[in-house]
Amino acid sequence: MKRLLISCLAAALLFSCGDANVLPEQYRQNDQKTKEEKQENNNNQEEENGNQGQEPQEDEGFETAAEAVVHMGAGWNLGNTLDSNSGDAEGMWIEAWSQRTPKDYETAWGQPETTRALIHMFKEFGFGAIRVPVTWYPHMGTITLYDNDKWDQSTWTGTAVDPAWMARVKEVVDYVIDEGLYCILNVHHDTGDGSTAWLHASEEGFLAAKDRYQALWEQIADTFKDYGKRLLFESYNEMLDPLGSWCFASFNAPGSYDAAVATSAYNGINSYAKLFAETVRASGGNNALRNIIVNTYGACSGDGTWSSHLKEPLTEFVLPEEPGHIAVQVHSYWNDEAFSSQKSDIDKLFVNLDTHLVKRLGVPVIIGEWGGKTKNDQSNATFAAYFAGKAKEAGIPTFWWMGLSDGDDRTVPRWTMPKTMGAIIQAYNQ
């Protein structure tokens, strides 16, 4: 199943095509590596003063968010995998036609089960980080269907995450951490414009969902509280107003703007960000100093000049805590085939991020998703070389969405878009 990602300029999923570079045989062994990161950064001190659960200190291995983003470099999204879900309350096909096992969800959108060898391939070729998108609603509480495949969200009860699902998420995170890579773990298609989304950017939406949202992050934070600095939590993916407006809040309103809807949406986003930060910090263990990530409205990056409201997701965002262990994330998709005419717009994007986020808030920025519109490896490589080069100059890590290794190529594992992969790595290594 294909999942469309929408942005102001373009949207795309990148599926299997083109030449492929295969990971050497010696790297396809499912070896059990030592968990150096978690052991090195387990900072619950008990030696001298007996203060069990004492908060970790900076000199015990944790770094600032600004340091972390520089160390990440090139990243990739393990997309259409743990984020897979039915996505339609009128057609809950996974729930209706499967046993609802972790594998049923992980493979529902056409990707194989994630392996350690796949993650190792990214490490071997020079990537520094992997974002692990996770959709949680199918695995929280009890979802009861009617008419075989329909879901009335008002009947949703309970907030406990299925232990089997949490265990699989943890296993995949361990693959990333064990390779010495940074890992971003998030709340993904619980947001967006689908009818199964339950997190909406509005004051009313926040009040309705805040208890469930807090309960979810309490469970995630507790599960991973002893992990070291290479694990980052991301608050939510692309949260939209109740109208499902992309680009900026209330874009789908009559006249393409409604000040009241927009204000409520930006207030809602800021409230979710604040609750997320407070919940993680209160959860104990290494979460007191863990680097966390909050996204702008819709993860919008202010691309374009066709509306005076395009910069609002940046200018209206309020940082939920003092800078130090927090970063802001945006997403940015482009038409790779029209790249030559977009260079100046890409340049402006990085100026806007610097002006409205880095300098205004004193916070580092992550581009958590980016990509081109087509599956053409050569045109994407040309575009990626320029975009990644500008990001490297700005000190911003970028996470390409999906297609570098896709579908059956992940099983080998090998590259689906080797030229694009190489262009990204070269840009960050210059």
Task: Give residue spans per PLM region.
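Active-site mouth of glycoside hydrolases
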Residues: 61-302, 424
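Bacterial Sec-dependent N-terminal signal peptides
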Residues: 13-60
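A short acidic, helix-capping loop that chelates divalent metal ions and anchors anionic groups
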Residues: 140-141, 193-194, 337-339, 408-410
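Extracellular glycoside hydrolase catalytic/binding regions
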Residues: 101-103, 215-232, 236-397, 410-427
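Sec-dependent bacterial lipoprotein signal peptides
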Residues: 1-15
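Short gly/ser/thr-rich secondary-structure transition/capping motifs
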Residues: 56-59, 110-113, 305-311
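Acidic carboxylate-rich catalytic motifs and surrounding loops in phosphoryl-/glycosyl-chemistry enzymes
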Residues: 401-406
